[in-house]
């Protein structure tokens, strides 16, 4: 039904791995588009950093001809997403209009079931209320809860 509304189209993001330099510009863009707050150094040390895209680094070749390869890992917008049915308050659900996985932040009660069920480990729990200092609050996306 959702694919009928979208003419059979599904959303995804394509990355040319031969051109990826690991610069993390995609991570910054994702934070800006989805109102994800920047994590402090302390949060990163505690393993509580908010990031929806992570960049995996792999080494290829042997010394002295070693090359770093980067693999961005992000939400795959699964058609039958394992993160959706486990949420007891339906904070994680599949939009039938856009055919994408959506999370309603202010509905989340923090069970973290969605993060535990995500095979790509991109669902995270926001441990603190998001804080955007001036002038960062001016850039928030009004279409995101």
Where are these regions (language model features)?
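Non-ligating segments of multi-cofactor redox enzymes
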Residues: 1-145
């Amino acid at each position: 039904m959702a694919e009928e509304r979208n003419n059979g189209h599904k959303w995804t993001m394509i990355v040319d791995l031969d051109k990826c330099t690991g610069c993390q510009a995609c991570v910054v863009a994702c934070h800006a588009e989805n109102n994800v707050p920047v994590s402090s150094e302390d949060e990163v040390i505690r393993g509580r950093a908010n990031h929806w895209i992570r960049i995996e680094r792999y080494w290829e070749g042997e010394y002295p001809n070693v090359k770093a390869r980067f693999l961005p890992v992000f939400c795959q917008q699964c058609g039958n997403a394992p993160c959706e049915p486990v949420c007891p308050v339906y904070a994680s659900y599949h939009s039938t209009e856009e055919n994408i996985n959506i999370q309603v932040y202010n509905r989340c009660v923090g069970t973290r079931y969605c993060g535990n069920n995500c095979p790509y480990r991109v669902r995270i729990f926001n441990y603190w209320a998001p804080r955007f200092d001036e002038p960062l609050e001016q850039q928030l996306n009004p279409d995101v809860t």
